[in-house]
């Protein structure tokens, strides 16, 4: 049975969300169209308010409503350690596991020729300047164990190779191949940090 073109356009828009396939997109589209106008207006309003008022920390790119996020402002964090993660979800996942007390740097993407994602499309290019301007002694690269994640990790390692007195680590065994941090449980994350591989002294 054919559906109105507007319905198909809504489904296509919903499919652009992470992890949403055709089946769930259709389910959500039917759900939204069955709601009253107030529900739709409130939903749109909240999305617009979040997009307008939520900023990115000027240091790590974490979501905040100030120039600096609570993590970067927390004087009890270990300012000698910097963990490089791909997404805000990765940061939240590690924080919820309560296994790390350093600072973060969110790349907002991984280098991918397949997806046409280059350095300029990410926050990778700001890593070196931040390391040079900070007091970091240890860098932990926690990009995913996918092809794109490995390419990104290698690029970051090369970018930082001329900085003296900097130890560089890659998260260790525990995170499955072709997987990312947000799918790992607390124990797996803990083991990946315990077993982190030293890339450079």
From Swiss-Prot:
<comment type="function">
    <text>May play a role in DNA repair. It seems to be involved in an RecBC-independent recombinational process of DNA repair. It may act with RecF and RecO.</text>
</comment>
<keyword id="KW-0234">DNA repair</keyword>
<keyword id="KW-0233">DNA recombination</keyword>
<comment type="similarity">
    <text>Belongs to the RecR family.</text>
</comment>
<dbReference type="InterPro" id="IPR006171">
    <property type="entry name" value="TOPRIM_dom"/>
</dbReference>
<dbReference type="Pfam" id="PF21175">
    <property type="entry name" value="RecR_C"/>
</dbReference>
<dbReference type="InterPro" id="IPR034137">
    <property type="entry name" value="TOPRIM_RecR"/>
</dbReference>
<feature type="domain" description="Toprim">
    <location>
        <begin position="80"/>
        <end position="176"/>
    </location>
</feature>
<dbReference type="InterPro" id="IPR015967">
    <property type="entry name" value="Rcmb_RecR_Znf"/>
</dbReference>
<protein>
    <recommendedName>
        <fullName>Recombination protein RecR</fullName>
    </recommendedName>
</protein>
<dbReference type="GO" id="GO:0006281">
    <property type="term" value="P:DNA repair"/>
</dbReference>
<keyword id="KW-0227">DNA damage</keyword>
<keyword id="KW-0863">Zinc-finger</keyword>
<dbReference type="Pfam" id="PF21176">
    <property type="entry name" value="RecR_HhH"/>
</dbReference>
<dbReference type="GO" id="GO:0008270">
    <property type="term" value="F:zinc ion binding"/>
</dbReference>
<feature type="zinc finger region" description="C4-type">
    <location>
        <begin position="57"/>
        <end position="72"/>
    </location>
</feature>
<keyword id="KW-0862">Zinc</keyword>
<dbReference type="GO" id="GO:0006310">
    <property type="term" value="P:DNA recombination"/>
</dbReference>
<dbReference type="GO" id="GO:0003677">
    <property type="term" value="F:DNA binding"/>
</dbReference>
<dbReference type="InterPro" id="IPR000093">
    <property type="entry name" value="DNA_Rcmb_RecR"/>
</dbReference>
<keyword id="KW-0479">Metal-binding</keyword>
<dbReference type="InterPro" id="IPR023627">
    <property type="entry name" value="Rcmb_RecR"/>
</dbReference>
<dbReference type="Pfam" id="PF13662">
    <property type="entry name" value="Toprim_4"/>
</dbReference>
């Amino acid at each position: 049975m054919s559906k109105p073109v507007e319905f198909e356009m809504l489904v296509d828009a919903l499919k652009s969300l992470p992890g949403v396939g055709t089946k769930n997109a259709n389910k959500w589209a039917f759900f939204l169209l069955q709601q009253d106008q107030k529900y739709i207006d409130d939903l749109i309003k909240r999305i617009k308010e979040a997009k307008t008022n939520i900023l990115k920390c000027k240091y790590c790119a974490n979501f905040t409503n100030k120039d600096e996020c609570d993590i970067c402002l927390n004087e009890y964090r270990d300012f000698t350690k910097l963990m490089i993660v791909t997404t805000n979800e990765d940061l939240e996942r590690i924080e919820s596991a309560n296994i790390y007390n350093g600072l973060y740097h969110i790349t907002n993407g991984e280098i991918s020729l397949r997806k046409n994602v280059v350095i300029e499309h990410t926050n990778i290019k700001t890593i070196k300047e931040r390391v040079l301007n900070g007091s970091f002694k240890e860098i932990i690269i926690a990009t995913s164990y996918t092809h794109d994640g490995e390419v990104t990790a290698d690029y970051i390692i090369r970018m930082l190779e001329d900085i003296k007195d900097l130890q560089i680590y890659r998260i260790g065994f525990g995170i499955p191949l072709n997987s990312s941090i947000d799918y790992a449980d607390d124990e797996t994350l803990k083991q990946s940090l315990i077993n982190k591989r030293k890339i450079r002294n």
